[in-house]
Amino acid sequence: MNYYSTSIAKLIEELSKLPGIGPKTAQRLAFFIINMPLEEVKSLSQAIIDAKEKIKYCRICYNITDTEVCNICSDKERDHSLICVVSHPMDVVAMEKIREYKGVYHVLHGVISPIEGVGPEDIKIKELLDRVKNGNVKEVILATNPDIEGEATAMYIAKLLKPLGIKVTRIAHGVPVGGDLEYTDVVTLSRALEGRREL
């Protein structure tokens, strides 16, 4: 039995399609939205429409932007000889939060995943190779996630880049700050040991 009016039920249904939003959260959001002033609701819906219509991909790095070239790629202060390869635009946000990386990025828009039918041709690997061949690139940092697909993607890209004579590195993985060694899995501990550095 449906306890809601058709319009509320539809709003809940649409909200639950968002990642991380289950039925309960969707219901809570729906009731919050219907209690908002109409002008705020219109502003919210317009912001969603504007973002969808105006956002595109940077023609250089494929990060999301509302201009032809994103702010990072157009920044002359950045080191354009250093490219950090990430899987998704949100990874750029995560890297930028640490405020230590001064190079540029390349967003793959996915990882190689045969189980999900995603091959190398389905993500922005060719574009990365073209960029490296045509640019003055000295180092490519592979910063895909440390899961099976991320590792496979990094290894595949490294194999393609090695013959081009540029330095190819992988971000270190290891024990999280505040983590206990006894609760850390074997693979993470092994990588932490491999990625150790001199003090």
UniProtKB/Swiss-Prot annotation:
The keyword Manganese does not apply. Residues 81-176 form the Toprim domain. SMART domains: HhH1 (SM00278), TOPRIM (SM00493). A zinc finger (C4-type) spans 58-73. This is Recombination protein RecR. It comes from the Bacteria. Pfam families: RecR_C, RecR_HhH, RecR_ZnF, Toprim_4. May play a role in DNA repair. It seems to be involved in an RecBC-independent recombinational process of DNA repair. It may act with RecF and RecO. The lineage of its organism: Bacteria, Bacillati, Bacillota, Clostridia, Thermoanaerobacterales. Keywords: DNA damage, DNA recombination, DNA repair, Metal-binding, Zinc, Zinc-finger. Gene3D superfamilies: 3.30.60.80, 3.40.1360.10, 6.10.250.240, RecR Domain 1. GO terms for biological process: DNA recombination; DNA repair. Belongs to the RecR family. One of its GO terms (molecular function) is DNA binding. InterPro entries: DNA_Rcmb_RecR, Hlx-hairpin-Hlx_DNA-bd_motif, Rcmb_RecR, Rcmb_RecR_Znf, TOPRIM_dom, TOPRIM_RecR. The keyword DNA damage applies. NCBIfam families: recR.
